[in-house]
Swiss-Prot record:
Source organism, top-level taxon: Viruses
InterPro entries for this protein: Corona_NS4
Protein name: Non-structural protein of 4.8 kDa
Pfam families, per database record: Corona_NS4
Family: Belongs to the coronaviruses ns4/ns4.8 protein family.
Amino acid sequence: MPMATTIEGADYTNIMPITVLTTVYLGVSIGIDTSTTGFTCFSWY
């Protein structure tokens, strides 16, 4: 897990549940959800 994701994810933990971080982490591992889930998370920034 990149540091950037951990730091930015920490701020989002206050707004959203840890489920979001789990989904992104699983998405990276699978590789398929990364395109959908990852893109959605980055769009919020």
